Amino acid sequence: PFHRKKIVYTRRVNFQQFGFFTKLKYRFTNKIVGISTAAQQTLIRFTQRKDVMKISDIAVKETEWENLTEEIAKLNPGNKKIVGIVAALTYEKQPFVCLSAMKLLHQKNNNFICLHFGSGTLFKEMQEKILANGMEKYYILMGFQQNILSWFKYFDVLLMTSLNEGLGSSILDAYLKKVPVVSGTSGGLADIVTAEKAMVCTSGAPEEYCEKTETLLSSPELAGVLTAKAYNFVVKNHSMAYITKQYDQLFKELLQ
């Protein structure tokens, strides 16, 4: 490049890329980094470069809780269990799978509500389906919330049904906050969602998400075992110090 400086390019999503100029960008990049194994492999296929690295550079840290007791009391006057979903209302996040799973769960266990955080192109259709299925009392669309991490304190389970994730920052946040997780393993989720840390769903079917969520809601002992291991994983592998060390090593090697 004209500036004659070393360039490191980190890609944190896992969407397929296209175009001549996009490929050209990578030709003039000294080192390419993918945030997960899936992102790394996508970059290798697109760039035809074998030197693509993987650094999972989403750092998590403890934050101050915002007290949301009053909001929770209004949303959940029956003090039921809360299934949290933090995902945009877009096709790849599969909100209709969430909806179907929660409908099935409610037929077995009505002692919960579901709070779905996120906005997107499917918002109106989701609203219509919730009303059409009579789910408005227990499936609540929360829209986009700036203070989303404060809501994690009130979750009994986090549900993730996404078709494709670069890594899955909401999963890492749940691990740090010791919230039990039910998730698939699509894309970068495979790097962080494993049987010792979460309830893993392999089929992508609403029935499986329902079953695994019900298991966690009814088994606090199992939830405790999973969240303890998940917490140890995230503080070790996703601290700022650990990620900084990996990039520091990369920069040193690049500048030799």
Identify the residue ranges that each predicted region occupies:
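A short, well-ordered alpha-helix in the C-terminal region of glycosyltransferases
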Residues: 208, 215, 222-237, 243-249
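Aromatic "clamp/platform" in nucleotide-sugar-dependent glycosyltransferases that forms part
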Residues: 144, 163
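Nucleotide-activated donor-binding/catalytic signature segment of Leloir-type glycosyltransferases, i.e.
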Residues: 127-143
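Short hydrophobic beta-strand element within catalytic cores of glycosyltransferases
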Residues: 180-183
